[in-house]
Amino acid sequence: MALLAPGTPIREGLDRIVNGRTGGLIVLGDGPEINGVCSGGFPLDVRLTPQALRELSKMDGGLVVSSDHERIKAAAVHFVPDGSLPTLETGTRHRTADRLSQQTGVPVVVVSASMSVMSLFLNGRRYLIERPEQLLARANQALATLASYRGRLVDEAENLTTLEIRDQVQVRDVAAVAQRVEMWRRIDAEVRGYVSALGVEGRLVQLQRNELSLGVEDLGRLLTDDYRPNSVAPGGFSLSGLQKLSWEDLLNVTMVAETINLGPAEHPLDSPIRARGHRQLTLMTDLSSRTIQRIIDHFSDLQSLVSASTSELGDIKGVGLRRAREIRQGLESIFEGDQRTHHH
C-alpha cells in the first residue's frame, strides 16, 4: 500500500486517471508469469511518470509496469488470465484483475471509470485504495484511541511502580500492565499502517504517533527484563504470545497471565512476585544497559536495591558516586511520593 500512497508517481498517475474518468488496469510487475497472460498491445520502456501513466491508460487494454515500479513496459495490452479461477467481481476489468493477481501473485490496480474508485487486487483479495481525506479521518480516530490507551497504560505502569517499591506486586499486576502494552501495540500498528498508506500526507499523523509512543515503546521489553524467571528454561516470560490472542481473550487477565507464562498453572494470580529493577533504573537514570545489568546482577532484585547505600551503589563498575546519588534520590522520591499518597 505504501507504493500507492499519496505523493508517489504511481498514485499521482492513478489520481489523474480517476479525474479523467477513463478508468484503467495496471499490472504492478513484469516477468515471465505476466508475459504468459498478455496478448496484443505493444512493448515499451519509458520512465513511469504521472503524465505517462495517464496518457497511456487512455487506450483500450491495460498497462504493465516493471517490478521495481520505475518504468512502463507495455501498453494497450489485452490480458487473458485463466477463466476458471474463482472471482466474486462483476465488472469485466475487476474480474480480469482479480484472476490476474491470483494467477501471477503480482498486484494489479483497477480504476473504475464509472465509480472513480481505485482497487488493488492481490492474492485473491481486493483492497480499496482510499482517498487521503478518508484515510486521515480513520487515522485520527485511531490516534485518539491510541492516546486513551496510552493514558491507561501509563496509569497501570505507575501503579506497578508503587507496588514494586512497597514489595506488594502480584502476578495479576504484571499481567495487567502486559495486557495494556499489547492493547497499545495493536492500535499503534494500525496507526503505522495509516502512516504508510498516507505517504506524504501522513507526516502529521507520524509526528503524533511518535509523541504517543514516548516512554511507552520500551515498556514491554523492560517488563520482560524485570519479571523473566531466572532459569533459562524455554517458554519463559514473554509478551510475544499475546499477539495471537483474540481481543476477547486479551481482556481476560487470567488468559494474559497464562500466555506470558506467569500463569495460574504455577503461580495463582495473587502470588507475590518481585521486579529486578530494570524499569526503575531506566526511568530514573541515563545509565547504559550494561551498567544497569551490573547493578541488577549485584542486588538481584529491586527490594535489595531500595535498601542499598549510596556508597554500595557507587562501588559498582560504571556507576560512580554522582550516579549513585541520582539512583538513591530517584528511589527516595518514588518512595516519598508513595508515602504522601498513602497518607492522604
From Swiss-Prot:
Entry's EC annotation: 2.7.7.85
GO molecular function, one term: adenylate cyclase activity
Obligatory cofactor(s): Mg(2+)
PROSITE patterns, sorted: DAC
Pfam families given in the database record: DAC, DisA-linker
Keywords: ATP-binding, DNA damage, DNA repair, DNA-binding, Magnesium, Nucleotide-binding, Nucleotidyltransferase, Transferase
Residues annotated to bind ATP: G61, T92, R93, H94, R95, T96
Reactions that this protein is recorded to catalyse: 2 ATP = 3',3'-c-di-AMP + 2 diphosphate
InterPro entries attached to this UniProt entry: DisA, DisA_sf, DNA_integrity_DisA_N_sf, DNA_integrity_scan_DisA_link, DNA_integrity_scan_DisA_N, DNA_integrity_scanning_protein, RuvA_2-like
One record GO biological process: DNA repair
Record domain DAC: where: 1-133
Subunit comment: Homooctamer.
Family the UniProt entry places it in: Belongs to the DisA family.
Function statement: Participates in a DNA-damage check-point. DisA forms globular foci that rapidly scan along the chromosomes searching for lesions. Also has diadenylate cyclase activity, catalyzing the condensation of 2 ATP molecules into cyclic di-AMP (c-di-AMP). c-di-AMP likely acts as a signaling molecule that may couple DNA integrity with a cellular process.
Protein name: DNA integrity scanning protein DisA
UniProt organism field: Cutibacterium acnes (strain DSM 16379 / KPA171202) (Propionibacterium acnes)
Designated gene of the protein: disA
